[in-house]
């Protein structure tokens, strides 16, 4: 038998019907549902008189529209309707839901892993583009549209064209204060927002292996920003230890058996990818996006580029348009860009380790005058754990707002938005025009970089900032 990549192994194991050159019917192991992309899907089932095929393989939560202050008092009529509709649909169709009053409520891509629902070798879908987050566990996880949500609810299967395979090999060792977020931003800045189109990416190399599970989730979360169908990392001992004891993970001897099965998922020696790209981690510095797509980013020691630096006319126009929207001048040092807002949260960087990293840098310091800074845990479970460690007090004493969980300022679908023309250092995953509110200017950064910007009032090189004296 020819050597296979992990991508091919999972695909082949889940193919119900498949023919070379034609779409395959894939079996879906886990379907996660939220309030925004599911209402029409459930209504389609209702009109057709169909039940949910496998409610036991379906899990729901609400996150996009949830207020992070006074979360039970939802002022927006559409948001309130979507949340109420999800609750009613889950009750009618027998689906487990982590509602607003649940201790397990949170962002769908945070609670799936922490509850042990996400496991190696699974096919996982959700009506959300950042479903790729779950690929950090060695799962084939990708976002789907509302009509596909209905198809999975009805059949527990999905027609999909087989993707090409890609390896992104990250060699070397990260410098201190350089993070997983910087890796993925650097990869996208180097290769662009479409290099992954038509592919599923496997991230490999010693720099990837050295990351924690939460850091790996950050990497896979943003694989969609490279245009990829999904991104994943082969499971290893780090994966297994994270899953051990999780509520929905196998227990006892079953867990030992599962580990043997999960270990067999690793890409075979000699397996051939359709494309291979490389990145040296030791060359990566803390990253900041300056434009309106995730590829428009650079190291913190650099300057805002000029349209004259473009390699072709299309890129020149794109740079010019982005600079106009962002209100930036070519040649401006990144460290001279002032910010008015800081957001530490989202399905990219709202886990406990992200909050610990930010709190460590913030402790004993104060948020700069004129800066509004928010910390939004990715789940109620993360929030409780952070409060148990006293992280909330560190943030509040520094002048940050400490919130309940939710998608929050990542997108302008809830009360947490950035005013028009103002600038935000954000740990989220997208910096498109209007993403955080009409006219909002978003700079994507790591939690460390966001925390440092909150204190300084502008971007700073976190590598040297950490050594500066703290106030008492």
Swiss-Prot record:
Polar residues bias: start-end ranges: 290-304
Stretch list, region Disordered: 289-312
CDD domains per record: IPMI
Protein name per the record: 3-isopropylmalate dehydratase large subunit
Involved pathway(s): Amino-acid biosynthesis; L-leucine biosynthesis; L-leucine from 3-methyl-2-oxobutanoate: step 2/4
Catalyzed chemical reaction(s): (2R,3S)-3-isopropylmalate = (2S)-2-isopropylmalate
GO BP, sorted A to Z: L-leucine biosynthetic process
Binding site for [4Fe-4S] cluster: 347, 407, 410
Note on how the cofactor is bound: Binds 1 [4Fe-4S] cluster per subunit.
EC class of the enzyme, as a word: lyase
Enzyme Commission identifier(s): 4.2.1.33
Function, in words: Catalyzes the isomerization between 2-isopropylmalate and 3-isopropylmalate, via the formation of 2-isopropylmaleate.
Family, similarity comment: Belongs to the aconitase/IPM isomerase family. LeuC type 1 subfamily.
Subunit structure: Heterodimer of LeuC and LeuD.
Cofactor annotation: [4Fe-4S] cluster
Taxonomic classification: Bacteria, Bacillati, Bacillota, Bacilli, Bacillales
Gene (UniProt): leuC
Gene Ontology MF terms: 3-isopropylmalate dehydratase activity; 4 iron, 4 sulfur cluster binding; metal ion binding
The entry's keywords: 4Fe-4S, Amino-acid biosynthesis, Branched-chain amino acid biosynthesis, Iron, Iron-sulfur, Leucine biosynthesis, Lyase, Metal-binding
Record-linked PANTHER family: 3-ISOPROPYLMALATE DEHYDRATASE (PTHR43822:SF9), HOMOACONITASE, MITOCHONDRIAL-RELATED (PTHR43822)
Record-linked Pfam families: Aconitase (PF00330)
Entry annotated with the keyword 4Fe-4S: yes
InterPro entries: 3-IsopropMal_deHydase_lsu (IPR004430), Acnase/IPM_dHydase_lsu_aba_1/3 (IPR015931), Acoase/IPM_deHydtase_lsu_aba (IPR001030), Aconitase_4Fe-4S_BS (IPR018136), Aconitase_4Fe-4S_dom (IPR036008), IPM_dehydratase_rel_enz (IPR050067), IPMI_cat (IPR033941)
């Amino acid at each position: 038998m020819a050597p296979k990549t992990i991508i091919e192994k999972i695909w082949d194991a889940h193919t119900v019907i498949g023919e070379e050159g034609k779409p395959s019917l894939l079996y879906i192991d886990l379907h996660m549902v939220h309030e925004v992309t599911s209402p029409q899907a459930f209504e389609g089932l209702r009109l057709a008189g169909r039940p949910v095929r496998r409610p036991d393989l379906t899990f729901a939560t609400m996150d996009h529209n949830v207020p992070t202050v006074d979360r039970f008092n939802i002022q927006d009529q559409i948001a309130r309707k979507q949340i109420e509709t999800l609750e009613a649909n889950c009750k009618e169709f027998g689906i487990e839901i982590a509602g607003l009053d649940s201790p397990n409520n949170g962002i769908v891509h945070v609670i799936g892993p922490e509850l042990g629902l996400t496991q190696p070798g699974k096919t996982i879908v959700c009506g959300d583009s950042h479903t790729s987050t779950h690929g950090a566990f060695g799962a084939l996880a990708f976002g789907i549209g509302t009509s596909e949500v209905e198809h999975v609810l009805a059949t527990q299967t999905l027609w999909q064209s087989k993707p090409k395979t890609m390896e992104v090999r990250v060699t070397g060792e990260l410098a201190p204060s350089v993070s997983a977020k910087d890796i993925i931003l650097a990869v996208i800045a180097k290769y662009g927002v479409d290099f992954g189109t038509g592919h599923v990416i496997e991230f490999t190399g010693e720099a990837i292996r050295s990351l924690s599970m939460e850091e790996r989730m950050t990497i896979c979360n943003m694989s969609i920003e490279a245009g990829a169908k999904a991104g994943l990392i082969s499971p290893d001992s780090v994966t297994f230890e994270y899953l051990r004891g999780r509520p929905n993970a196998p227990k006892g001897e079953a867990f030992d058996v599962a580990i043997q099965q999960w270990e067999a998922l690793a890409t075979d020696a000699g397996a051939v990818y359709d494309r291979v790209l490389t990145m040296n981690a030791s060359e990566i510095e803390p990253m900041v996006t300056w434009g309106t797509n995730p590829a428009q980013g650079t190291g913190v020691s650099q300057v805002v580029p000029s349209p004259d630096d473009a390699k072709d006319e299309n890129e020149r126009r794109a740079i010019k348009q982005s600079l106009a929207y962002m209100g930036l001048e070519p040649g401006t040092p990144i460290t001279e860009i002032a910010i008015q807002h800081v957001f530490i949260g989202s399905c990219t960087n709202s886990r406990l380790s992200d909050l610990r990293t930010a709190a460590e840098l913030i402790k004993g310091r104060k948020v700069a005058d004129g800066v509004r800074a928010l910390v939004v845990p990715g789940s109620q479970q993360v929030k409780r754990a952070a409060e148990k460690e006293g992280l909330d007090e560190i943030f509040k004493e520094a002048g940050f707002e400490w919130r309940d969980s939710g998608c929050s300022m990542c997108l302008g679908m809830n009360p947490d938005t950035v005013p028009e023309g103002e600038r935000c250092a954000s740990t989220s995953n997208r910096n498109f025009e209007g993403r955080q509110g009409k006219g909002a200017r978003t700079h994507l950064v790591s939690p460390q970089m966001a925390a440092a910007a909150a204190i300084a009032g502008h971007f700073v090189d976190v590598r040297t900032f950490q050594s500066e004296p703290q106030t008492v």
